[in-house]
Regions:
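Feature captures the FAD/FMN-dependent oxidoreductase FAD-binding
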Residues: 10-81, 202, 209, 247, ...
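Short hydrophobic core segments
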Residues: 41, 67-81, 116-120, 140, ...
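Glycine/threonine-rich phosphate-binding loop and adjacent beta-strand/alpha-helix elements that clamp
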Residues: 279-348
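Short beta-strand to alpha-helix junction loop
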Residues: 5-24, 36, 120, 190-200, ...
């Protein structure tokens, strides 16, 4: 958050560190009393007569339904279905005698010590799982249909930490924050302006970590240009270290079917495993999966025009956070929060009950 400095020396934080930061922020601002836990909004109906949202809320502890109202509906749940991850329809999954796990349903008591593990996928989830499991497993294989771009760098910002030591807490945080924002913009502009050179640089970067003998052309040369899809960050090069140690391997092939012992590939090779992890992504779910109606008419979001990536045409008093996709998500979310506060304060100042974006005659659908 812009108002609360991140004091950890690590710029790439793990889940416990982020949770600790959030709890600290909540406690410092006495926000816990304003948060209702284990509650899920399942339906929201806007009443133009009352200028209110009527909500149906499910209590997750006993599945009871409560009804309440609000002036403004601010959706901050992202655009994924966190209840269930995406898993392709693999042939003969039921034949596999081991465990098949999607990271979204990760069992806390999973014992993978000295086990053969296959991770299907090559995105951010797979890149996180492979090095974190490599130390304990017998062997772990990252099975990918096609390669992804990777960039390894330290998880600590030495320049940023040096700046913080020379300045006050808030000034240092402000300067480092802007340094990182500008560096991200410069990097993105370079990627887009010189895609071929950037592609060569990223592939050579992988070669430096894995050595000339590694088949980088097959396993680490994507079919697309950098930033057509997002790059994967490899903190401290941990995934490459796991591969160099021999505990982790990349296989580039397509899946024919599951077998009792593992996975048979279209090449004819069979990979054996005790555990198969399907790091194959998440399902999209817009507007938090809430059944939204405007004066009892169901909202069809596909027919609406988005305004400033946060509001929708002809939908009153609703804001949905959508952060950046080419920079830190939270930077975009923070700007939307600021705009929302200014907008609500403006309504109070003008003694208005609602706001509602409208499309003009000059708007062209794309």
């Amino acid at each position: 958050f812009k108002f609360k400095p991140w004091r950890s020396p690590k710029t790439i934080a793990d889940a416990p560190s982020i949770l600790s930061y959030l709890n600290e922020t909540v406690d410092e601002n006495d926000l816990r009393k304003k948060i209702q836990f284990n509650k899920k909004v399942i339906a929201a109906t806007w009443s133009s007569i009352d200028a209110l949202w009527n909500l149906k809320v499910e209590d997750q502890t006993d599945n009871s339904i409560e009804e309440t109202t609000c002036n403004f509906l601010y959706l901050c749940g992202g655009y994924y279905n966190y209840d269930e991850g995406y898993t392709p329809e693999f042939k003969n999954v039921e034949a596999f005698e081991g465990q098949v796990i999607h990271p979204q349903k990760w069992p806390e008591d999973l014992d993978y010590t000295n086990k053969e593990v296959i991770v299907i996928g090559s995105g951010a989830t797979a890149v996180t799982i492979v090095p974190s499991m490599a130390e304990k497993v017998k062997h772990i294989t990252m099975l990918q249909r096609s390669p992804t771009y990777y960039f390894a760098a330290p998880d600590e910002d030495k320049i940023g930490n040096f700046i913080k030591k020379l300045t006050s807490d808030r000034l240092g945080y402000f300067l480092v924050r802007w340094k990182n924002i500008l560096m991200q913009r410069v990097m993105l502009n370079r990627l887009r302006k010189h895609p071929e050179k950037t592609k060569e640089m990223l592939i050579n970067h992988v070669r430096e970590h894995l050595g000339e003998d590694y088949d980088v052309d097959k396993h680490f040369t994507p079919r697309y240009m950098p930033w057509d899809q997002r790059l994967c960050f490899v903190p401290n090069g941990d995934m490459f270290q796991a591969m160099n140690s021999g505990k982790a391997t990349v296989v580039t092939d397509t899946i024919n079917e599951f077998t009792s012992k593992g996975i048979k590939l279209d090449s004819g090779e069979e990979l054996e495993a005790d555990i198969i992890i399907t790091a194959t992504g998440l399902n999209m779910r817009l507007l938090n999966g809430i059944d939204i109606k405007i004066d009892n008419e169901t909202l069809d979001i596909s027919q609406k025009t988005q305004y400033k990536t946060m509001m929708f045409s002809d939908v009153p008093n609703l804001i949905a956070t959508f952060g950046y996709t080419t920079a830190s998500w939270t930077l975009g979310a923070d700007l939307i929060s600021e705009y929302a506060c200014k907008l609500i304060n403006l309504l109070d100042k003008k003694d208005c009950d609602y706001f509602c974006p409208e499309t003009g005659d000059d708007v062209v659908a794309e």
